[in-house]
Amino acid sequence: MEFITLENEVVKLKPLELSDLPGILETGSYPEIWSHMSTTIEKKEDVNKFVENALKAKNEKTEFPFVIVDKQSGDIIGSTRFMDIDDKHQRLEIGYTWLTPAYWRTAINTNCKYLLLRYSFEHLHLQRVQIKTDHDNIRSQKAIERIGATKEGILRNHMIRKDGTTRHTVMYSITIEEWPQVKKHLERLLV
């Protein structure tokens, strides 16, 4: 996979780099971001680990991490990535998406997903893109459903959270056959 920057007039998704550490630390320092995530960013060491792990996965070509930049302010406001990349079966997952709370319930996530999905289906020619979330993360489920993804089911006892409790995972997907309709839907939301 080529390391690319995706952007429109609202948002820029640029490949994560070591130089993004300060922006991620500032943007990710809100505990509410991490309540349903498998990682937490509270201090510089957490950011270092987050970026190191992401860059390692990028070098291994198993993930492609982006930072999310608000085009109006130029600030880093979150992160997302392509992960579980499977060339043989022409699929990947969009995941590890987080935004600083000031950008929750804005057009940013919709713009990000549109850019990622369009690239996945129209440039990578994938058959399937999946997105999954914690069953307790209702806000995320609503956001995924809002973009037009199909809820496939729940993976029971799928993960152990950082606090030791069991997480069930809600699985969503968009297939190549669904993409034209989802694309039209997203383009209406972006207007």
Kindly give the residue locations of the regions a language model identified.
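Conserved GNAT acetyl-CoA-binding A-motif
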Residues: E122-K132
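Conserved catalytic-core motifs of GNAT/GCN5-like acyltransferases
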Residues: Q130-K132, T150-G164
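GNAT-family acyltransferases
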Residues: M1-T106, Y119, T165-V191
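Conserved acetyl-CoA-binding loop-helix of GNAT-fold acetyltransferases
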Residues: R105-Y119, K142
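Conserved beta-strand-loop-alpha-helix junction that forms the acyl-donor binding cleft
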Residues: I131-Q141
